[in-house]
Amino acid sequence: MNKAVVVFSGGQDSTTCLVKALNEFDEVHAITFDYGQRHRLEIEVAQNLAKELGVAAHKVMDVTLLNELAISSLTRDDIPVSHELQENGLPNSFVPGRNILFLTLAGIYAYQIGAQTIITGVCETDFSGYPDCRDDFVKAMNSALVKGMDKPLVIQTPLMWLNKTETWALADQNNALQLVREKTLTCYNGIIGDGCGDCPSCHLRKVGLNDYLDNREAIMASLVEKQHAES
């Protein structure tokens, strides 16, 4: 049986990856991490979506230790989310080590259930520039997991080279445009769906959606062309 594990937050990107995986794999598991994120509603949204979409299993893991080690506006209510980059060139929403931990735990879970594929919605074209969302990082993590577990695990990143407009097209391609638009939580201020409209995440999401709706046919054609080039 062809199994996959999706790293799932309940946001736009991971939900798009989840619906795509459900169309491609025999059995899909979702794994969500409780790391003390700014909005506890994220966990509830992920649980509701996993149930609605009918995943084989949805595991919520407590990794709140990360909150004690990594200071970020995504984990601390007293740190406002800022549009400005810090001295290190990263936004204050960067949680150091987050995806290292998430992919390691997802790899352990995949090993235990006999899945060979891990799917994550990280993306190099996102505005953030997080180092643990880059393609070279994912390839390095993939190599480490394979060597450390002596198992042929593959980390898939369906969104790695897509912009936000094309990510909306991918959701639409998998018959999930409305679900992703109305039921996911991407907003830094904890508002489901279209969000607050002001935070960096909402701005990126809104611009991408409007562009897709205005240029639907051309963008879908561009997405299909990219997919054919990668296959």
Swiss-Prot record:
Listed pathway(s): Purine metabolism; 7-cyano-7-deazaguanine biosynthesis
GO molecular-function term, one example from the UniProt record: ligase activity, forming carbon-nitrogen bonds
EC number assigned by the record: 6.3.4.20
Keyword Zinc part of the UniProt annotation: yes
Pfam families: QueC
InterPro entries given in the database record: QueC, Rossmann-like_a/b/a_fold
Note describing how the cofactor binds: Binds 1 zinc ion per subunit.
Keywords on record: ATP-binding, Ligase, Metal-binding, Nucleotide-binding, Queuosine biosynthesis, Zinc
Catalyzed chemical reaction(s): 7-carboxy-7-deazaguanine + NH4(+) + ATP = 7-cyano-7-deazaguanine + ADP + phosphate + H2O + H(+)
Annotated binding of Zn(2+), by residue: C187, C196, C199, C202
GO BP: any one term: queuosine biosynthetic process
Cofactor: Zn(2+)
Positions bound to ATP: F8, S9, G10, G11, Q12, D13, S14, T15, T16, C17, L18
EC class of the enzyme, as a word: ligase
Protein purpose: Catalyzes the ATP-dependent conversion of 7-carboxy-7-deazaguanine (CDG) to 7-cyano-7-deazaguanine (preQ(0)).
Family: Belongs to the QueC family.
Protein name as it appears in the record: 7-cyano-7-deazaguanine synthase
Lineage of producing organism: Bacteria, Pseudomonadati, Pseudomonadota, Gammaproteobacteria, Vibrionales
Gene behind this protein: queC
